[in-house]
């Protein structure tokens, strides 16, 4: 997948090149507001990897593909693993294919937002629309098989087997479905 995925484009850069590139992006965004001179030291917040990810899923040639968009394209790269993710998320795209298979009955793609929590994976499916009672039961069974902490559809909880929690400082916080969370623990600590 390296070199094909839009998110991987800069991963091979040395730290100085990466720092200059990222700082340049921030300065360019702030320049129209006259604030680019206020950008100071670069703080690396990569940490041990991304703890949240949104995969894209669609049907292709009779199969389900789940992964990231190819750089400058709408094509989904079928993902087996990604070195930028925390270990808990490494094989999640592949593992979540049965959920996508239940929802992808047409060519309409869906998104699968996944957060690694201390209780297990918190999964929010997006792009499908309301689920019938029968589909909700099938999704619940699949969540059980996959040992998900929680499964929701556009923030509507299908099943919560364990409250998805993360540590923020000394507190253990239960996340609402589909909420924003800093991508890395190191980024949150800032």
Task: Please annotate each region the language model reported.
Residues 1-190:
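Accessory RNA-recognition modules of RNA-modification enzymes
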């Amino acid at each position: 997948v390296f070199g094909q995925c839009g998110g991987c484009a800069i991963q091979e850069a040395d730290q100085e090149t990466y720092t200059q590139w990222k700082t340049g992006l921030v300065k360019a965004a702030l320049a129209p507001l006259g604030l680019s001179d206020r950008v100071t030291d670069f703080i690396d917040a990569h940490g041990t990897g991304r703890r949240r990810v949104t995969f894209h899923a669609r049907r292709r040639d009779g199969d389900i593909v789940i992964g990231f968009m190819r750089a400058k394209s709408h094509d989904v790269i079928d993902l087996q693993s990604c070195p930028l993710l925390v270990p808990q998320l490494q094989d999640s795209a592949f593992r979540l294919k049965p959920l996508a298979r239940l929802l992808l009955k047409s060519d309409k793609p869906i998104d699968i937002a996944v957060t690694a929590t201390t209780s297990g994976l918190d999964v929010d499916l997006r792009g499908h629309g309301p689920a019938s009672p029968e589909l909700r039961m099938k999704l619940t069974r699949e969540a059980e098989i996959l040992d998900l902490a929680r499964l929701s559809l556009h923030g509507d909880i299908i099943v919560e087997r364990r409250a998805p929690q993360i540590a923020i400082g000394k507190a253990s916080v239960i996340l609402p479905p589909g909420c924003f969370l800093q991508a890395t623990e190191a980024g949150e600590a800032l």
